[in-house]
Amino acid sequence: LMRKEKKNDLSRDEKKELADLHLQKASFDKELENWNKNRNAEDFVKLRDMYNDAGVKIYGFKPNYLLRKGNSDANINYAMQAGKALGASHVTIELPEDPTHSLKLGKLAQKNGIKVAYHGHTQQHINWWDTALEQSESNVLNPDLGHYIAAGNTDTFEFIKKFSSKIYSMHIKDRKSLANGQDNMPFGMGDTPIKEALQLMRDNKYSFPATIEYEYKTPDDSTIIEELKKCVAYCKNALDS
């Protein structure tokens, strides 16, 4: 509707609909302004305790919007303090294209006593994080093994070994390689060396978590929960063999 408004191409009903949306946004902005005045990162301690009581430890937190370029220092500090209150060792965001922002995030992370782990998709390669790592000890990695393979990289184990002390968490999924079409596949059916990567972590006693990220199409005769059980079993079998 806003694009059509710029072209002066709105019907009478669309003008009314857009006016209603503007009113809703103004109301939401007012509520958000009031919330910002009273927000407290310590409120996240209650959420952490709820998860801990259920046997779940929160190791990472992705307040993606609040970490993006253009946000105020206050918003970024709040996001990092919330992550720390949750018990996370790091907050995550896609590695910014603008290196001045990763520099800023690194400085604020150091101030808040937490790390910023930079995620990637098919932009990833072994040198992709170099600038951010040089900028601050608080800048670390949150790579994605499946996307790394889909990007056409063939140095997976070299990459993991090189950055083992800088990887704070890693997503695992099974994707086809760039040459084979990059599709997301059930575990064990793609080109991603999940089994070998997990065994490398085990044998070298790397302590960072590997997180299953479910992205392949759920078969018609199955459910996401059933498929996740298969993913977990695949990983357990890899570690037991």
Language model features: what each stretch is:
Residues E33-K37, D43-M50, A54-V140, I149-A151:
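Active-site acidic/histidine proton-transfer and metal-coordination neighborhood
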